[in-house]
Each structure stands twice: as C-alpha cells, then as structure tokens.
From Swiss-Prot:
Localisation per UniProt entry: Cytoplasm
InterPro entries referenced in this protein's UniProt entry, alphabetically: Chaperone_TorD, DMSO/NO3_reduct_chaperone, HscB_C_sf, TorD-like_sf, TorD/DmsD_chaperones
Domain of life: Bacteria
The protein's name in its UniProt record: Chaperone protein TorD
Job description of the protein: Involved in the biogenesis of TorA. Acts on TorA before the insertion of the molybdenum cofactor and, as a result, probably favors a conformation of the apoenzyme that is competent for acquiring the cofactor.
GO terms, biological process: protein complex oligomerization; protein folding
Record keywords, A-Z: Chaperone, Cytoplasm
Length: 216
C-alpha cells in the first residue's frame, strides 16, 4: 500500500468513526439546544445530503429531514424532543423501545443479558471507559456505537481491531433490527433516526466484510 492509499484509508476510517460517534451522541441522552441547532443548521443539512448520496441511506435521510421539519415548527422544539426521547426509550419494552441490546435477545425483555456481559469484556479489552451520565448498562446502543468508532480508527493498523469490528457488528445488528422495528411504534424524530442508523450500520457491515474478505 503506497502513501496515497494509506492517507485515503485513514481519511475513510475517520469519516466512519465520526459517523458512529455522531449517532451515539444522538442516542445517549436528550438533545441539548446546541445539538438541535446544529442539526437544523446548514451543517446538519450538508451532513444529511452527504449521507443521502449513498442510495441505501437516502430513504432514511429523507425521513429524518421530514421529522426535523416537523420539530422546527413547534413552539418549544427541545422540550418536545426531550418528551419524545422519554416516550421512545425510557419506558419498559412493552410501551417503548429501550435502547439496550439485551432487551431484544430473549423473550421477556430482560436487561443485563449476554450483550451486556460481552460489552463489559470488550470495553475492558480495549481499555475504554464509558463516558455516560449515570450507570448505564454497557449494551446501550450508544455505547456500542462509541466502541465501534474507536475500533474503526484502531483498525487502520490493527488486524485485531478489524476482527473486533466484525464481532461487534454481529453482536449489535440482530437486536438493533428488532429495536428499530419497535421504535416505529412512536413515529417522529427518533423513529426516523433509528431507521437511518440501522441502514448505516448495515451498510458498514457489508463494506467491511467485503474489505476483509479481499484482504484474506
């Protein structure tokens, strides 16, 4: 691999990691005023336009744009979104869609199942601390996305981190698909965000599996 190819690989990894961290920041807690203003600004539009250039992400981007347009006409958009966040994610699995992988791996929606234990192990292995408010289970999708962003950057020069990306996606995607389906029971911003997230993660899995198979 020549110097130009290395620079391109690093730049791609930085873009992927940034997107994983962006989605994590959207999910980890209610949006603050700065996040909402940025999302509704020119930079937010540019981000969604760039994502929409990928055909598999275009429908999700369009839904998120429509949801944002609806939010912007509200009298108190940040407060309304905070209420939507609570309704969407903070109830039990019967009435909302808690963003924890464990809830979707076994009937009954139990917390602290295998995905949580696996994430604790991975976070320790990669010496990463959870920077969340409160005492979140380690399999919160935002924590899993944050870890993925770190593995993407480490994977530029670490075959072990490349393999870890595939393992994390295999752990995360099946429960995420069920979670996204459950999110659609509460239409609006977070349902649209979840749908776009799933499209992005699914696309990334396809891309890295193709890259790793070619490298073998």
């Amino acid at each position: 691999m020549d110097e130009q190819e290395i620079r391109e690989e690093v730049a791609l990894a930085e873009r992927r990691a940034t997107l994983y961290w962006w989605f994590a920041s959207m999910l980890c807690r209610e949006l603050d005023s700065d996040q909402l203003n940025t999302l509704c600004s020119e930079s937010g539009r540019v981000l969604l336009d760039a994502l929409a250039e990928e055909p598999s992400l275009a429908p999700g981007c369009q839904k998120l744009r429509r949801a944002l347009a609806g939010v912007q006409v509200l009298a108190t958009p940040q407060l309304e979104l905070a209420a939507d966040y609570a309704t969407a994610f903070l109830g039990d699995h019967l009435g909302s869609a808690p963003p924890y992988a464990s809830v979707y791996v076994e009937p009954g929606g139990m917390m602290f199942q295998h995905p949580h234990q696996q994430m604790v192990q991975w976070l320790q292995q990669w010496q990463l601390a959870v920077s969340f408010d409160g005492n979140e289970p380690a399999d919160h999708f935002a924590i899993m996305l944050d870890l993925m962003g770190n593995l993407v950057l480490k994977g530029v020069d670490s075959p072990e981190a490349q393999s870890a990306q595939s393992a994390l996606l295999a752990e995360m995607l099946p429960p995420m698909r069920r979670w996204v389906t459950q999110c659609q029971r509460q239409p609006g911003f977070y349902a649209a965000l979840a749908e776009l997230l799933l499209a992005f993660v699914s696309l990334d899995q396809t891309l890295i599996e193709g890259e790793f198979s070619l490298a073998q």
